[in-house]
């Protein structure tokens, strides 16, 4: 992501939408709302559905004609057999399990895909009031009501590197990741906040050797690249979006800071 990306500034408009959805979701956090199970047995709540309804409405108003693939809609009705060159990926509440536990690591996400790449995106963490989004000048972080702050991913440190990992990562798998990628510390964390932490230089690597969906990471991937970081397959190959024939499922990936 760079100043040559004409779509990067769309991230600001997307952040307006994710922040509006966050304001809708936040009162439902720690409210004892009912949790339902989706077809794949993953949890879904009223907050997921309310956030998605608002986001879909706002995207239709601001970007008419651009297709949208969203998590809850896909869960209920399935994903399309094909998608065009340009479309949005929406996860209205990434980190639903954290949300249910009362943890703060859940996010609202919108990513714009063009020709298989994330070209704009916004991520908002309702519990902290923080947003990260793409601009033509790079990745930006802002607190609710505060000024924009340009953020940059850091280079791999000479000392101890920090990895962000899933709460469900088993110890034996953690040791295998340490051996492969050479980080020193690991910090459990949910949702796309992991990508934003690397984008702002607070961590160094997020190795994901497990299942995710495209909407889980598209927005955070856009922010990370805009901040000078990168996300690729474990072998370093570019990470593609729009995998309609695979149900928009991701393979393994590794997110890192600056080269």
Language model: regions and residue ranges:
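Short, hydrophobic alpha-helical packing/hinge segments within bilobed ligand-binding/sensory domains
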Residues: 51, 108, 194-195, 220
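N-terminal subdomain of lithium-sensitive/metallo-dependent phosphomonoesterases centered on the IMPase/IPPase/PAP
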Residues: 1-93, 176-179, 237
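Acidic beta-strand-loop-alpha-helix segment within the catalytic core
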Residues: 110-196, 244-259
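Residue-level signal for inorganic ion chemistry
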Residues: 25, 48, 59, 96, ...
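Glycine-rich active-site/cofactor-binding loop and its immediate structural neighborhood
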Residues: 84-127
């Amino acid at each position: 992501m760079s100043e040559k990306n004409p779509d990067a500034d769309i991230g600001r408009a997307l952040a307006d939408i994710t922040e509006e959805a966050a304001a809708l979701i936040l009162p439902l956090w720690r409210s004892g709302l009912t949790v339902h199970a989706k077809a794949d047995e993953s949890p879904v709540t009223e907050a997921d559905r309310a956030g998605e309804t608002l986001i879909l409405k706002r995207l239709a108003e601001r970007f008419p004609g651009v297709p949208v693939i969203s998590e809850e809609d896909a869960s209920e009705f399935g994903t399309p057999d094909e998608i065009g060159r340009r479309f949005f990926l929406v996860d209205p509440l990434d980190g639903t399990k954290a949300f249910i536990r009362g943890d703060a690591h859940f996010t609202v996400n919108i990513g714009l895909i063009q020709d298989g790449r994330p070209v704009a995106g916004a991520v908002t963490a309702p519990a902290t009031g923080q947003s990260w989004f793409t601009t033509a000048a790079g990745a930006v972080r802002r607190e609710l009501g505060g000024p924009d702050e340009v953020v940059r991913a850091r280079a791999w440190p000479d000392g101890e590197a920090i990895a962000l990992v899933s709460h469900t990562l088993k110890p034996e798998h953690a040791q295998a990741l340490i051996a492969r990628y050479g980080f020193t510390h690991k910090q459990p964390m949910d949702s796309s906040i992991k990508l934003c932490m690397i984008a702002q230089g607070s961590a160094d690597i997020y190795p994901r050797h497990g299942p995710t969906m495209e909407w889980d990471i598209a927005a955070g991937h856009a922010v990370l690249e805009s901040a000078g970081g990168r996300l690729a397959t474990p072998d370093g190959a570019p990470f593609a979006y729009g995998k309609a024939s695979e149900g928009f499922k991701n393979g393994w990936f590794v997110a890192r800071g600056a080269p």
